[in-house]
């Protein structure tokens, strides 16, 4: 290549900073970045507009009349799986004892005591949570029942069982956070900001959201691509607390649809019925947690809440 002068010259002629050999490329990249940024902003605006439209459905006159009953209905959904499990143990008492004693080789006395304690604990704990009485003890007892049954029955072998149990615990935490009484002190008629109850509720809601999302990891990739896309968007938004009401509605509708169409245990009379019934009520518990979040909001540890501050 022939000599083209010192650095900064082209053919011996000095160049201005705006006429360098790479200035066109730099300008192109700048325009491209601006174009990409514009597209992302447009997508964000369209998404927020669509999300707001979905959230607006909750302002319907019929929904508004039902709103006072939503927390109670949500809590009942959350604990429905515990009622179902208790009644199943009682109705299949001899089968439960035979399975744990003969197949799992637990001592007979231990099996009887375990089943009695678990059944009574689930019935009492679920009832207390629905009535919002002693919710801290009720939540602890129900979480202990989930973990102890998983250990005794050996339900840690299947990933779907484990993730679903974590999601049920997430629903319990959300129900517990909803029951926290906001005892805010006042000074000069001004409410106390960032009370301990608010922070505790925020942490519980965040933990509950993350645990509920775990179930959708196994659920998502076994469905159609359209459902996969919607579920991924919904789970990300729900986990970080961005457009949380929209995410809760979308995930709740998706899970309700598949729960009714796939876990329709009422059409079966064989052993498959028990398995489908188990999955149906566990999914109903998760739906209850999602429904409760639409009413309570995402809490302090969320993008939605931070946007209000900043």
Swiss-Prot record:
It is found in: Endoplasmic reticulum membrane. Residues 1-108, 159-209, 267-310 are cytoplasmic. This is ER-derived vesicles protein ERV29. One of its GO terms (biological process) is Golgi organization. Residues 130-137, 231-245 are lumenal. GO terms for cellular component: COPII-coated ER to Golgi transport vesicle; endoplasmic reticulum; endoplasmic reticulum membrane; endoplasmic reticulum-Golgi intermediate compartment. The keyword Transmembrane applies. A motif (Di-lysine motif) lies at residues 307-310. Residues 11-31 are annotated as: Disordered. One of its GO terms (molecular function) is COPII receptor activity. Its main location: endoplasmic reticulum. The chain crosses the membrane at residues 109-129, 138-158, 210-230, 246-266. Constituent of COPII-coated endoplasmic reticulum-derived transport vesicles. Required for efficient transport of a subset of secretory proteins to the Golgi. The C-terminal di-lysine motif is required for exit from the endoplasmic reticulum. Required directly for packaging glycosylated pro-alpha-factor into COPII vesicles. Facilitates retrograde transport from the Golgi to the endoplasmic reticulum. The di-lysine motif confers endoplasmic reticulum localization for type I membrane proteins. Keywords: Endoplasmic reticulum, Membrane, Transmembrane, Transmembrane helix. It is a multi-pass membrane protein. Disulfide bonds: none annotated. It comes from Saccharomyces cerevisiae (strain ATCC 204508 / S288c) (Baker's yeast). Belongs to the SURF4 family.
């Amino acid at each position: 290549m022939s000599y083209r002068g010192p650095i900064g010259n082209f053919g011996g002629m000095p160049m201005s900073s705006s006429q360098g050999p790479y200035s066109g490329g730099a300008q192109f990249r700048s325009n491209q970045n601006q174009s990409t940024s514009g597209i992302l902003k447009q997508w964000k605006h369209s998404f927020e507009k669509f999300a707001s439209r979905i959230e607006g459905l909750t302002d319907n006159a019929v929904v508004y009349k039902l709103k006072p009953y939503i927390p109670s209905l949500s809590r009942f959904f959350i604990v429905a799986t515990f009622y179902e499990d208790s009644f199943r143990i009682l109705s299949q008492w001899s089968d439960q004892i035979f399975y744990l004693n003969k197949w799992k080789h637990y001592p007979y006395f231990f099996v009887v005591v375990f089943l009695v304690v678990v059944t009574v604990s689930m019935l009492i704990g679920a009832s207390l949570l629905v009535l919002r009485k002693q919710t801290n003890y009720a939540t602890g007892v129900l979480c202990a029942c989930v973990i102890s049954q998983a250990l005794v029955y050996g339900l840690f072998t299947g990933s779907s069982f484990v993730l679903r149990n974590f999601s049920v615990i997430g629903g319990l935490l959300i129900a517990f956070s909803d029951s926290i009484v906001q005892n805010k002190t006042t000074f000069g008629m001004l409410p106390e900001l960032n009370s301990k109850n608010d922070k505790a509720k925020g942490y519980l809601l965040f933990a509950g959201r993350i645990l509920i999302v775990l179930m959708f990891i196994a659920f998502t990739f076994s469905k159609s691509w359209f459902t996969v896309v919607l579920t991924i968007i919904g789970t990300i938004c729900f986990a970080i607390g961005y457009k949380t009401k929209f995410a809760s509605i979308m995930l709740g509708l998706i899970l309700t649809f598949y729960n009714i169409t796939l876990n329709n245990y009422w059409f079966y009379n064989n052993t498959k019925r028990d398995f489908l019934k188990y999955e149906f009520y566990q999914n109903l518990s998760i739906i209850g947690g999602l429904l409760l979040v639409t009413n309570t909001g995402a809490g302090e540890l969320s993008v939605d809440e931070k946007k209000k501050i900043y």
